Amino acid sequence: MRNFFIALFSPLAPRLRRVHPNVLTLFSLLAGILAGISFALTGLAPLFFLVGGGFVALSGMGDSLDGIVARAHGRTSRTGDFLDHFADRLVDVAILAGLAFSRGAHAALGFILIVLALLHSYLGTQIEATLGRRSYAGTGKAELFVAFIAFTIPAYFLSAWYLRVGQHRLAFADLFMLALVLGTAISLVQRFRRGLQACMRADGGDR
């Protein structure tokens, strides 16, 4: 999915020659924060689900374009990479926290999801620090953004719907978070296993 978005947005790079990649990173961050705020406001009006989905799309576009523009115009830098990764984590937390406080949602599920998402991202960074190459194994941010955008449409129409499980009521957002928790947990295990195997192979090759 990541490669698909790189191919999709690469034609825009020549038009953005005068835009610094860090500006696109900041744009992605601001759009992500606004997405989280929008999801948190869905208790006031379900329309904010659709607004949040729009901001998620804009955030994802900015996140793809900053690296594309940097590579296309020779503006890659350690500073840009650092800012990009930090902004990515802030966007993750903002969007997931907004979902946790969305209409009818259980905040505890959102907290679990944030922890899993940060651990998943940390593993990729740690593999890069240990082996010198970034791991994008498992579910990535591109897939997460697509899932969020797809979620917002039924969430708007099903904002008053609940699933009763015993004495508990689960909103549509809860079911979405449960699916994300399961998917992220599976991806986390896969990334850990592949990273560990890569480290063990590297250790064997050094002997």
Language-model segments: residues:
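Hydrophobic alpha-helical transmembrane segments
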Residues: 1-53, 95-207
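Glycine-rich active-site/cofactor-binding loop and its immediate structural neighborhood
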Residues: 47-76, 80-81
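Basic, amphipathic juxtamembrane/active-site segments
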Residues: 67-109
